[in-house]
Amino acid sequence: MQNNIIIFDTTLRDGEQALKASLTVKEKLQIALALERLGVDVMEVGFPVSSAGDFESVQTIARHIKNSRVCALSRAMDKDIDIAADALKVAEAFRIHTFIATSALHVEAKLRRTFDDVVEMAIQAVKRARRYTDDVEFSCEDAGRTGVDNICRIVEAAIKAGATTVNIPDTVGFCLPTEYGNIINQVMNRVPNIDKAVISVHCHNDLGMATANSLTAVQNGARQIECTINGIGERAGNTALEEVVMAIKTRQDIFKGLDTRINTQEIHRVSQMVSQLCNMPIQPNKAIVGSNAFAHSSGIHQDGMVKNKNTYEIMSPETIGLKKEKLNLTARSGRAAVKSHMDAMGYQQNDYDLDKLYAAFLKLADKKGQVFDYDLEALAFIDMQQGDEDRLSLDVITSQTISNLPASAFVQVELDGKKISQVSNGGNGPVDAVYNAILAITDMDITMLHYNLTAKGEGAEALGQVDIVVEHKGRRFHGVGLATDIVESSARALIHAINAIYRANKVADLKSHKISQ
């Protein structure tokens, strides 16, 4: 049995399903390239049949990724499989992942078929996928609530049809570790041709068991773990990549000889990138990547750490690429110093625009005095999300709030190269007043669906990041703004979203013109 645990990352497929607004193709590619540097073996990057946008994303990522296998999901249907293959065909190496529900509840209530029908559909789907690639994965959806006899039967049939990986997912996070381990053990021992395929596991976290179930499965013979960065995913999320990887690495007394190809020093950086781009804050006490994961506030713990780090630290923060902050970046620091800090955090030159980052850094340093590594990181991420063709930009903003009176605001923006000013009175607070002014200037019909403020750093001069989701003509758009002033960061978030709307409208107009021709 192989000693390498295959890491199958599904952040861009299963993880993205949890987001309030879809990622752009550019953002998905940025994450995919980061996952490649992280060392994931397989990345599942979309469901091409679901939309033209998903097809484009899968195709774009497939074209750029060279060192990881690119995978796309499809139902056990010819159309799905053909479209997935079409999106993936430009890839250096690719996998088609096809699935069908196998639990009695799903078979009878959703599919309205017999289990015999389901087995035959699985066989035909695998055979169809094998026309395009010799790397085919088959999944038994809701295997956690499927009888073991039926799991073994359909797994054997799928392998015989040509599946090289068989996935036994706990789709609704129903299983406890002992149950799930037993399922994997029985599949290993009862399926006669199991030696011709890799057993994969895909666990959800509805009962908080995703990581435990995945690790128990490995102990019982599974050799692929399907997971996401930060555990993002539908409902309570998926198995967190960073948790299973670091558990295997840290507990070699249990997982003797087993390892992954993950470059663990990239974990912190990729975790932060996914959190920022997906607008999914990381809870402070999140294992491995939370801000408190390596914090020790108890006096007894601090004393022990000073004497010997191993007293309360089972892994080094440097192992996941977490560097200690330095307080020596000021407005007097040069470009080389900024680049040095970015290098120390693991960023490569093509991850960000140094000229733009340095200009933003100088503005922030003038306001804050000292600039921390996490400030640079936030500025770099925000810059990555800005479009090259922004029509709207913020110039001047002031707001005033007097007790028991509506808030007022003055906003000056540049729209298509022209400076436009607007005064707004009657706002329900300064942010509302500023938003009213911006919407009056742009004459944009927008519904605010989500507003979230996150502090980036510590103290009164911490950066405030505002993430919003707005709806315009039935579509959702994400905006993000960063500033030391909450009102300014809120304004920048709205302007970011409006620029996204302008670009979407421009694309729609171009498509409409092309069709009319």
From Swiss-Prot:
Record-level Gene Ontology MF annotations: 2-isopropylmalate synthase activity; acetyl-CoA C-acetyltransferase activity; manganese ion binding
UniProt protein name: 2-isopropylmalate synthase
GO cellular component, one term: cytosol
Pathway participation: Amino-acid biosynthesis; L-leucine biosynthesis; L-leucine from 3-methyl-2-oxobutanoate: step 1/4
Protein purpose: Catalyzes the condensation of the acetyl group of acetyl-CoA with 3-methyl-2-oxobutanoate (2-ketoisovalerate) to form 3-carboxy-3-hydroxy-4-methylpentanoate (2-isopropylmalate).
Source organism superkingdom: Bacteria
E.C. no: 2.3.3.13
Subunit structure: Homodimer.
InterPro entries documented for this protein: 2-IPM_HCS-like (IPR050073), 2-isopropylmalate_synth_dimer (IPR013709), AIPM/Hcit_synth_CS (IPR002034), Aldolase_TIM (IPR013785), LeuA/HCS_post-cat (IPR054691), LeuA_allosteric_dom_sf (IPR036230), LeuA_bact_synth (IPR005671), PYR_CT (IPR000891)
Keyword Transferase annotated: yes
GO annotation terms (biological process): L-leucine biosynthetic process
